[in-house]
């Protein structure tokens, strides 16, 4: 049946039995397709009936359907004509793992960062009103913990003050990656446990109003009493007191019930909250039995067992996790903070070992940062573990609440640089540019697991300001030994005998191994290369000035945007020191990159061993910088 669904209109003629069959078919499709490519499986298994109902009630794209935390949009993609492309999910030139404006007119926003859909909805509804579009509803599907983010409540405050037709669907599965925490989560849990008193009261209203003479008076008295009891006992008052209509809670796996609730909400023609209770991983035993994450995201797996088909090597996240636990065992002042991602950021083991020193603040990076500032003021040393891309959300708090007060807070930035399959919104290519302008900030970029352990230990010893440790996604690889350490800077390679100090390569973090390989290629071209790892890359160590002055060309290699990264900082440091050495950088262009593997993206932008070696050869030739004016081949193949 799924093959016959080319668009939402094809759902309108289906019977209830056919809808149930289609839901089962969609789940089976999701399990087998996502098992083959990797992706967000659990969240999408939980929204099958909800998404079917949305597309039967609303006229997409005339009525925009916005998915907060857009990893919930796989079923939406299937129902809008893209099921045939799921073999390419998250692959280069294939389907995005998130809504994508370039894919379909049904995708309004490139949504993947949480808590933003309601603000989009507020703006769209205002625009439709100003443009005279009277019969357009805006639907925002908010779930997977997004309502723990403060931006949602800022938007709700504005939406509630209007009469614009915004339908807010709360997909309540009690989770983000892990179980959702906080007061709001407890409110939703209370709503789930309520009996269907609204239905009973409605029957009572009809009966009382039917009594001759005194019926209306009795009804009004009953209504007043009911309102008082409801305000005292019902958690949904957090919505209704804002002026929002509330419908629910609804069984999110009963398509007919969800559809009825959505039609009811649509008829309000005003802001309304529809509370839908779903189960993440619904219908797939391996996901339902995954207590920690309900298979929120997975790599390539066996669809029958849910087990990974290959075992990855030791990863950066695991190395961080182990090291933090070792440090915390020695230091009672070390505490850990996550923004709803204990598993992905490596803090699950810390939570089990030190539950009283672990804080999951929900999807609230801004609060995480200022809460960390408070902890530091109180004598603790907070370690805030975030994906690099989510640091962007907490910049003001980092700058004004942490750095201005010179507080010892350590930020650990996982998924720095190019992450790949999750696309533009998840690349961590801005962190060095952001961190580099923060006064007093010290940034480490470990090249391997040994340096990660070393630099994290150094970071938590800093008492007079914030620190950050950044590393990429994936396997950590082999340790890369240093030839020597000069004033804190590790020297990884030096010119071969008989070659001059032609080029200084400053390798940032995980690009160290590639930089050493580049040096070997250039040696064969007669170019003498020194490769160094600054370890603490920002601010630029003083030893870099000394090393640069002894070479004819300085090249930085980094997986940050070229503007404002380590390359920019090195150039500025040399100018201030009046060291007149040409500087070049091999860095990411200032662009948003489509989803593809990390290797594919780096190859596309020229950050490979061969391309960098060829670039340096050309720069050296142009500068005439080789010893004795030797002729340098343009080819390093």
From Swiss-Prot:
As its record notes, the protein acts as a catalyst of: D-glyceraldehyde 3-phosphate + pyruvate + H(+) = 1-deoxy-D-xylulose 5-phosphate + CO2
Q: Which Gene3D superfamilies match?
A: 3.40.50.920, 3.40.50.970
Q: What's a single GO MF annotation on this record?
A: thiamine pyrophosphate binding
- Cofactor(s) for this protein? Mg(2+); thiamine diphosphate
* Pfam families reported for this sequence: DXP_synthase_N, Transket_pyr, Transketolase_C
The record's section on SMART domains has: Transket_pyr
Q: In which pathway does it act?
A: Metabolic intermediate biosynthesis; 1-deoxy-D-xylulose 5-phosphate biosynthesis; 1-deoxy-D-xylulose 5-phosphate from D-glyceraldehyde 3-phosphate and pyruvate: step 1/1
Q: Which residues bind Mg(2+)?
A: 144, 173
The residues that the entry says bind thiamine diphosphate are: 71, 112-114, 145-146, 173, 284, 365
Query: What keywords are assigned to this protein?
Result: Isoprene biosynthesis, Magnesium, Metal-binding, Thiamine biosynthesis, Thiamine pyrophosphate, Transferase
One GO CC annotation: cytosol
Q: How does it assemble?
A: Homodimer.
Q: What does the function comment of this entry state?
A: Catalyzes the acyloin condensation reaction between C atoms 2 and 3 of pyruvate and glyceraldehyde 3-phosphate to yield 1-deoxy-D-xylulose-5-phosphate (DXP).
Family under the similarity heading: Belongs to the transketolase family. DXPS subfamily.
Tell me which NCBIfam families the record gives.
dxs, PRK05444.2-2
The name this protein goes by in its record? 1-deoxy-D-xylulose-5-phosphate synthase
Name the gene for this chain: dxs
């Amino acid at each position: 049946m799924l093959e016959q669904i080319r668009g939402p209109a094809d759902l309108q003629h289906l019977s209830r039995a056919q809808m149930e069959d289609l839901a089962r078919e969609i789940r089976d499709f999701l399990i087998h397709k996502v098992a083959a490519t990797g992706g967000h499986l659990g969240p999408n298994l939980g929204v099958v009936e909800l998404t079917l109902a949305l597309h039967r009630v609303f006229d997409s794209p005339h009525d925009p359907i916005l998915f907060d935390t857009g990893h919930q949009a796989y079923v939406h993609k299937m129902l809008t004509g893209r099921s045939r492309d799921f073999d390419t999910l998250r692959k280069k030139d294939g389907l995005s793992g998130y809504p994508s404006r370039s894919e379909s007119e049904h995708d309004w926003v490139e949504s993947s960062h949480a808590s933003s859909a309601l603000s989009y909805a507020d703006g769209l509804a205002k625009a439709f009103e100003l443009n005279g579009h009277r019969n357009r509803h805006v639907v925002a599907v908010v779930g997977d913990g997004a309502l723990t983010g403060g931006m949602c409540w800022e938007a709700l405050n504005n939406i509630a003050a209007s009469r614009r037709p915004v339908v807010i669907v709360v997909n309540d599965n009690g989770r983000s990656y892990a179980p959702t925490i906080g007061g709001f989560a407890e409110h939703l849990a209370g709503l789930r446990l309520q009996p269907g008193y609204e239905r009973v009261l409605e029957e009572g209203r009809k009966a009382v109003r039917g009594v001759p003479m005194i019926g209306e008076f009795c009804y009004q008295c009953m209504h007043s009493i009911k309102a008082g009891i409801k305000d005292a006992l019902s958690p949904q008052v957090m919505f209704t007191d804002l002026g929002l209509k509330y419908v629910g809670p609804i069984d999110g796996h009963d398509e007919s019930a969800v559809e009825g609730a959505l039609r009811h909400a649509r008829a309000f023609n005003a802001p309304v909250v529809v509370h839908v209770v779903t189960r993440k991983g619904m219908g797939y035993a391996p996901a339902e039995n995954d207590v920690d994450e309900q298979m929120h995201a997975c790599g390539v797996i066996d669809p029958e067992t849910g087990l990974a088909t290959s075992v990855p090597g030791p990863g950066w996240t695991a190395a961080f996790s182990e090291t933090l636990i070792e440090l915390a065992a020695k230091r009672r002042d070390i505490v850990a903070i996550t923004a709803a991602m204990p598993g992905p950021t490596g803090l699950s083991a810390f939570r089990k070992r030190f539950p009283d020193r672990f804080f999951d603040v929900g999807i609230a990076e801004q609060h995480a940062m200022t809460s960390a500032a408070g902890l530091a003021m109180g004598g603790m040393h907070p370690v805030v573990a975030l994906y690099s891309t989510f640091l962007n959300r907490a910049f003001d708090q980092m700058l004004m609440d942490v750095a201005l007060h010179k507080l010892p807070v350590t930020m650990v930035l996982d998924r720095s640089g190019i992450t790949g399959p999750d696309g533009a919104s998840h690349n961590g290519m801005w962190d060095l540019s952001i961190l580099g302008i923060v006064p007093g900030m010290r940034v480490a970029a470990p090249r391997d697991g040994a340096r990660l352990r070393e630099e994290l230990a150094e970071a938590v010893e800093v008492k007079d300001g914030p620190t950050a440790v950044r590393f990429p996604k994936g396997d950590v690889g082999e340790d890369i030994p240093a030839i020597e350490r000069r004033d804190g800077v590790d020297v990884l390679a030096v010119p071969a005998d008989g070659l001059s100090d032609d080029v200084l390569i400053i390798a940032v973090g995980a690009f160290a191994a590639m930089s050493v390989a580049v040096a070997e290629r250039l040696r064969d071209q007669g170019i003498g290369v020194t490769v160094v790892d600054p370890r603490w890359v920002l601010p630029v160590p003083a030893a870099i000035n000394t090393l640069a002055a002894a070479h004819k060309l300085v090249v930085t290699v980094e997986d940050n945007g070229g503007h404002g990264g380590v390359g920019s900082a090195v150039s500025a440091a040399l100018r201030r020191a009046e060291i007149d050495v040409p500087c070049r950088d091999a860095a990411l262009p200032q662009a948003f990159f489509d989803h593809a593997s990390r290797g594919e993206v780096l190859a596309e932008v020229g950050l490979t061993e061969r391309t960098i070696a060829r670039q340096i050869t050309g720069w050296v030739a142009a500068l005439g910088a080789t010893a004795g004016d030797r002729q340098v081949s343009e080819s390093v193949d």
